[in-house]
Swiss-Prot record:
It catalyses: 7-phospho-2-dehydro-3-deoxy-D-arabino-heptonate = 3-dehydroquinate + phosphate. The gene is aroB. Keywords: Amino-acid biosynthesis, Aromatic amino acid biosynthesis, Cobalt, Cytoplasm, Lyase, Metal-binding, NAD, Nucleotide-binding, Zinc. GO terms for molecular function: 3-dehydroquinate synthase activity; metal ion binding; nucleotide binding. It comes from Prochlorococcus marinus (strain SARG / CCMP1375 / SS120). This is 3-dehydroquinate synthase. GO terms for biological process: amino acid biosynthetic process; aromatic amino acid family biosynthetic process; chorismate biosynthetic process.
Amino acid sequence: MNQDNCRIKVNLKNNPYEVVVGSEILYTIGEELLRINIRTGEKILIVTNPDVSKPYSRRFITSLKEAGYDANLLILEAGENKKNYESIALIHNAAYEHQLDRGSLIIALGGGVIGDMAGFAAATWLRGIDFVQVPTTLLAMVDASVGGKTGVNHPKGKNLIGAFHQPKLVLIDINTLKTLPQREFRSGMAEIIKYGVIKDLELFNKLENEEDLSNIYSIKECVLLELIKISVSIKARIVEKDEKESGLRAILNYGHTFGHVIETLCGYGHWLHGEAVSMGMVLIGQLALRKNLWNVDDALRQEKLLTKAGLPISWPKINNEDVLRTLKGDKKVDKGNIRLIVPLGIGMVEILNDVSENEIKSLLESI
């Protein structure tokens, strides 16, 4: 590895692991598995999608086989509209066909949807087998691949079916971003901006100082590496303190409660996850203004930075009653109370557990 690559430890009590971040490290997967003591000869099922499989899977499998593993490939259609029971059944069928046992491994090679599905399939096959995350989208690199959340969507709500199942390893090669559509890249940038708002003023300032955040080719590789490392480190430290989201980890949901409403009501896939989160962040920013929790300047800074990243900031045209009904079914609702993460300033948020339905209704009517 060159000096720009790094290993970020996620120090969980029962399931510690490393996130390896670097450039041109995708095909070190075989040696990385040997390093974490995955025995040679074990069966490995790689779950990926067509856009990722075409440029990467052949050499990826070669790396595994050269390390002594029995590797097989399953190609699934990705996208939020495919994140369902049917796709999980396809993974389980492949696990049965290739005779995966409790010593076997599932590798997610792809974006957040592939990672969520492969992780959930691993969590539920034989009551749980190991899996590895190899994210190929910016959003998956800085968010979905770290922390052990896995699952699928339900027609009534996003990610309502799932499990906490920590990976054995996360391998991030930023070179895979070069084949990523620009819209997907911008979607991932929303999560990096989120980290700045919830926890890191310095990161937010750094993002503001970049001329263009909407195009991967306008950001220097060293800068992109640093942004990913900072984001992963922030999430790792939060997950270490609250693995199962009983308290602090909830701040990672900033913008997500309303973002998930958008994804559910507009149809999975109509808006990308980061786009929906961006609109959710702006709406929560407006709520914070109404409650005098932060100032207009910070709200405008957030909106300006999201716009610079090419992200939408205007709430879509959806029925307010549908929004309220969907909110009540969100997994972050506790005993009927709507729990929201609201900003106090750039780099600071707090959890509000008692936001009333009338407050939400008034907010929606004002935009």
